[in-house]
Amino acid sequence: MADLAKIVDDLSALTVLEAAELSKLLEEKWGVSAAAPVAVAAAGGAAPAAAAEEKTEFDVVLADGGANKINVIKEVRAITGLGLKEAKDLVEGAPKAVKEGASKDEAEKIKAQLEAAGAKVELK
């Protein structure tokens, strides 16, 4: 048990970079991956309907940039962190996804921001 306690102490003293390097070395030595396995669940008869009602992730899609594209471009830049050209291309290329996999609250907030700037927005 003394050896295990020493290992725990040594691991606790590692920096984040050292822990990441240790993880890579162990993956190589043991021939494994640290990626989490994806579980596949069997769908029941009512499961798809329940999943549609309880949707937790939304895609915020810019349907139309509207008449005031400059304000919409500013909002897209603020939301996504894109550069000016990328945000302009996104707005002018509507319909395009502004944010994918957003929570319901975040998606509603983004939708409100874009609509306040004059854009037409859909949540999918």
UniProtKB/Swiss-Prot annotation:
Question: What keywords tag this UniProt record?
Answer: Ribonucleoprotein, Ribosomal protein
Which InterPro entries does the UniProt entry name for this protein?
A: Ribosomal_bL12, Ribosomal_bL12_C, Ribosomal_bL12_C/ClpS-like, Ribosomal_bL12_oligo, Ribosomal_bL12_oligo_N_sf
* This protein's record includes keyword Ribosomal protein: yes
Which GO biological process annotations does it have?
translation
The signal sequence is none
Q: Name one Pfam family in it.
A: Ribosomal_L12
Is the ATP-binding keyword given for this protein?
Answer: no
Recorded GO terms, molecular function?
Answer: mRNA binding; structural constituent of ribosome
Question: What CDD domains would the database entry show?
Answer: Ribosomal_L7_L12
Q: Write out the GO cellular component annotations.
A: cytosolic large ribosomal subunit
How does this protein assemble? Homodimer. Part of the ribosomal stalk of the 50S ribosomal subunit. Forms a multimeric L10(L12)X complex, where L10 forms an elongated spine to which 2 to 4 L12 dimers bind in a sequential fashion. Binds GTP-bound translation factors.
Family per UniProt?
Belongs to the bacterial ribosomal protein bL12 family.
Q: Which PANTHER family match?
A: 39S RIBOSOMAL PROTEIN L12, LARGE RIBOSOMAL SUBUNIT PROTEIN BL12M
- Role this protein plays: Forms part of the ribosomal stalk which helps the ribosome interact with GTP-bound translation factors. Is thus essential for accurate translation.
Please name the NCBIfam families in this protein's record.
L12
Q: Which named protein is this? A: Large ribosomal subunit protein bL12
Q: Which organism is it from?
A: Brucella anthropi (strain ATCC 49188 / DSM 6882 / CCUG 24695 / JCM 21032 / LMG 3331 / NBRC 15819 / NCTC 12168 / Alc 37)
